[in-house]
């Protein structure tokens, strides 16, 4: 027998003051200082989870804070460089830059940091049923991530299948029912139990 340790932190919520703190003299951004203080603890864990609350929808859009965030991709670089190996990307701010921003964010993770398991969003809606898996010392973990909503009562229909939601959604109108659990959640958990030794569910409540 042996131990497998898990560390989870968040929310990594990039208000504009935090964004400004990472700006360098040459105009580039470096956010490594955000995680320097926790690195010794972080690197002692096997599973290192962070909730990246704000979307990285592309630097060319410009950066924005509350209520509709857009964060620098250098935040993602700092997360990966710090040693996080799981990123929870489903939050109420994931759709702040609409579908284009979500897709940019998903593509950034896939191509820039493929070593990081990103859960909660899908670049391809046909992959919405896929179960994110992480194997540590021959033990397989399913790590599921859902958000309660997306900063609106009505979800843009083009986001269906791209963002994991806790609430039920009318697929014709996009109306979200915050009192009813999305049946996809229980279906995912059921399939995850078949694929993994341990299932971890990370809901974003607010």
Give each language-model segment a name.
Residues 1-206:
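Acidic, metal/ion-coordinating pockets
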């Amino acid at each position: 027998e042996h131990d497998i340790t898990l560390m989870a932190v968040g929310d990594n919520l990039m208000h504009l003051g935090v964004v400004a703190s990472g700006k360098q003299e040459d105009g580039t951004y470096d956010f490594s200082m955000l995680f320097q203080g926790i690195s010794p603890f972080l690197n002692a864990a096997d599973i290192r989870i962070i909730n990246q609350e704000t979307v990285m929808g592309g630097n060319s859009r410009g950066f924005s804070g509350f209520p509709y965030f857009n964060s620098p991709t250098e935040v993602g670089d700092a997360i990966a460089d710090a040693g996080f190996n799981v990123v929870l990307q489903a939050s109420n701010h994931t759709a702040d830059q609409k579908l284009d921003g979500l897709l940019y964010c998903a593509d950034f993770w896939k191509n820039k940091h493929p070593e990081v398991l990103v859960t909660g969003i899908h670049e391809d809606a046909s992959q919405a049923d896929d179960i994110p898996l992480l194997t540590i010392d021959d033990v397989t973990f399913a790590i599921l991530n859902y958000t309660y909503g997306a900063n609106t009562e009505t979800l843009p229909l083009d986001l269906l299948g791209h963002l994991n939601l806790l609430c039920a959604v009318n697929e014709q109108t996009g109306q979200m029912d915050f009192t009813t659990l999305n049946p996809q959640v229980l279906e995912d958990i059921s399939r995850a139990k078949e694929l993994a030794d341990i299932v971890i569910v990370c809901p974003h409540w607010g």
